[in-house]
Amino acid sequence: MFTKTAIELIKELRGTDSIPHYNDTSIKATIDEMIALYEDLIKTITEHKEQKKEPFYLQHAITFHNSINRDKRCILAYLNERLNRIKEYRWSSGQSLLPDQLKERLSQNEIQFFSEYDKILTEYNSKVGLDLTIDPQPPKELYIEVRVIKELGEVVLNSGCTVNLNLNTTHFLKRSDITNLVKNGSLEHII
């Protein structure tokens, strides 16, 4: 069946919200299929010039052409979705370095894309003077209650206040002061 491998690529992404391993084998197999379909299309068109207006040959050529386009659309959708997930990872994690477990699942081009995207985002953040990845949603409350999960001792917050963050203590602090501590797992937001 034509386009079977390409459709499997799309199904592979649907099965998870994370970024699966880059499926180089299926991409290459789909491209090889596209080349073979193109050669069959050219062969059908050139060998049957006198019969090219007959419905059978027209439908034959249209089938090859549509299969090539479907393969191409599936590959582009696969790659686009992976890039969207890479961008989403950068925004949600706030990290400018890829962890090894994620890096091994990406192709070289995707790793390069992440680096370039990170440079653009970091440069933009520095020009604006804000880290836009910290809170993509506006906060509902200015102060939040947090519990200390990792012993930090005395900490000076962004606002200039000093607070003693001892293990298992709870505090009512300004959200903007402790967002990074919540993100890195030192504090836990108590709801």
Curated annotation (Swiss-Prot):
Gene3D superfamilies the record matches: 1.20.58.1030
Subcellular localization: Nucleus
InterPro entries listed in its UniProt record: GINS_A, GINS_bundle-like_dom_sf, GINS_Psf1, PSF1_C
Pfam family, one: PSF1_C
Chief site of localization: nucleus
Residues forming coiled coils: none
GO cellular component, one term: GINS complex
GO biological process: DNA replication; DNA strand elongation involved in mitotic DNA replication
Keywords: DNA replication, Nucleus
Function (record text): The GINS complex plays an essential role in the initiation of DNA replication.
Family statement drawn from the similarity comment of this UniProt entry: Belongs to the GINS1/PSF1 family.
Assembly information from the UniProt record: Component of the GINS complex which is a heterotetramer of gins1, gins2, gins3 and gins4.
Descriptive protein name: Probable DNA replication complex GINS protein PSF1
Source organism per UniProt: Dictyostelium discoideum
